[in-house]
Structures are given as C-alpha cells and as structure tokens.
C-alpha cells in the first residue's frame, strides 16, 4: 500500500491527503479555539486595540459632526464617509446643544441611535465624543459632563452597540502645560479622569473609554506620563488615549520633534491614537497655520499608530474639510490627500475593519468561504512558504488572509507571480483573495 502523507494541521480542522485539502469542521474544537478569547466589546492589550473577536484594530478614520452640528436634523453622511474605506468615525455630540435646532437634536437620543446604526451598518466603529468642554479647564464640570454616559437612555445605547463602540469622554478638556505648573496640573488631570473612569465602571459601562490629551488635545507628553497609572486604576484596564496633532507650537511643526513626542508615548506602552489630524490650525484667525501633517502620518504608518482626519464637512475652516459638501464625489484637495495619498491614505492604505462588523459575529466559519475559483491555482500546495499564483490578471496582486480573516503580508520573490509568506505567520491555512468572488485556499507547512 502506498504511504500516505501525515496530517500536519494542529487543530484537526484540515486533513491533507494526496495533496488535496479536505475541510472537516469539528464544532466543539472550533468553538473552544475561537471563542475562548472573544469578549463583548473592544478592548486593549498593551499598545494594541483589539476587537471583540480578538482581531487587532488599527483605527483609521474621520471626524464627523452628524446633523451638521445640530442644524440639519435629517442630514447623515455615513454612507459617503464609508466610501473612503475608513474603519471608524469619531462622532461629535453634545450633552447640551445650543438654542434652537441643536438643542432639540442633541437632546433626542433617537438621533444618536440613528447615527450609530448608520455607522456600524457601514462597517465603521463609532467613537462618541462629547464636545461641551472643549479646551476648558474645569475638573468639576468635566466630571459632571462625563456622567451623561451613565444616564439610563445613553446606557441603553451603549449596551446596544457595545460590540463596536468607543466612548471618547470629552473633547480636549483640561490644561496641564498651559497652567504654568505642569507637575501639579498632571496630578489634577489624572485624578479627574480616575474619578470619571471609576464612576462609569461603577455604573456598569465596560466599553473602552478614550481620554483626550490636555491643552486642547495637543499634549501627548502628559498622556505618556499619566497614561500607565490611569490604565492601572481602571478596573477593566480598558482605556485608549488620544492626542490631537495641532502641533504648530507644541512640536514646532517639525517632524523630528514629532518623532520624539511619539517615541515617548510608544515607550510608555499605552494604546494611543491621533484622534484629530488636520492640515490647518486656528489661532487668532481661522486656518491660520499650515500644519506639517504628512511626516506625522508617515510616522503613524511606520509605527502602526491609528489616526482620524478632521473633519468630514461643515467645518469653520472650509479648507480643513475632507469633502466640500459632504459627498465623496466632492473631496477637497486636502481630502484627496487624506484618502488617496499613496503612502498613508485611507483608501490607498486601508485598515482592516472589525471582524465583528464584517461578519456580525465572531464565528470563524463566517470568514471562510469554502468555494474555490477555477481560474486560480496555487503551486505548490501545500508549500513551505514560497508559492506561485497562476491565473492572475494583468496588474493584479494577490491578497492573502489566514482563517481568522487577518491580512497576511506577502513579499514578491522578484519573479512574476511568485510570492513568499514570512516565517512568523506559518505554519497555517491561508487563502488568496482576488476581488469579491475569486479565492483559493492553500496550506503552508509542508508534507512530512
């Protein structure tokens, strides 16, 4: 009798027999393997932000004020924002809107529900931020503002969208360097947010809480110093920190200084993003300073730091809008840069979306489409890391995923249609995806 190849898959979900792959799903094995680390919400681990399915999330998105800052009660543009391939939207909201239309829009939580629903239906993580205390320096007012999240109606919404929601407690609140006594002010900053976090956790809120840097969001150094302590004091250790890169003065608009500030935050090993990145900064007048944002976003790409562009539309500085009228077809020159720049653009370098939002659950089988394209062929299959893809069309580059739906980096070997997977990703089962309907499974580990 001819000797048969040995089974090499460690999870008993794949049998290799005479070079063919037969997928045998063992329900309990898959359930235990896949769901053991699943949680009800987004959470953090060291620097990483993880989805409820345990997938790593690199937040790349856009800031947006739905309903035109409360002045257009029927205006929602999430469908248009989704065309940028953003995987998150930071949603501007108010506890108390101004008189007239904004007051009625923000007080009606069904409007917030509609915004959240549209956002998640488009596969984007909503980040609710309260704008009432922007650039203010009142700890007591900030604590009172954050209690808005624990009121019954808001908590119902948090529970409804808990699998895909981040709460940005307040926009750019409190001062540290600006007080003239940074050491004392950092203590106040940390104490204030400790109180807020404890209050919200005591009310049963478990989703990640995002904390903006002080000094109108610019002071990343302060977050680097107090962030580890805030994380430690959070009963759930589930905080994300956010700086806003209006760094004309803070970093001298200089890429070297930017790298130094970012390096300090990386050394602190805290999960952080740039919650606002823009091309122009206000001061005495609107749009006063041109910001050196491109080097910053290159650093973000190299260091795998998330960022969100300010702002989609209806900004007081029209040249700082991604879209001139809220439609994807009307991107400004700044918007074109943020969406299509070959080095860091949202569309040209898209971040993977939350697995839960892609599939509606954490079931690994929903990621695996067991259908093979007849025009694609992997040679050899199984392989030891290097393989060729036959059937590629002109200009096509294969995209490879593992069984968890995570994108796997491959390198071109220098010859046409020949590629290599790095050793850190193997052994394993992968598939090549070309467009929506063309895919082919293959195995990397070898036949013994």
Task: Put a short name on every predicted segment.
Residues 18-33:
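Bacterial N-terminal signal peptides
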Residues 36-39, 358-374:
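Low-complexity, Pro/Thr/Ser/Gly/Ala-rich linker/spacer regions in secreted
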Residues 37-88, 102:
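N-terminal carbohydrate-binding accessory modules
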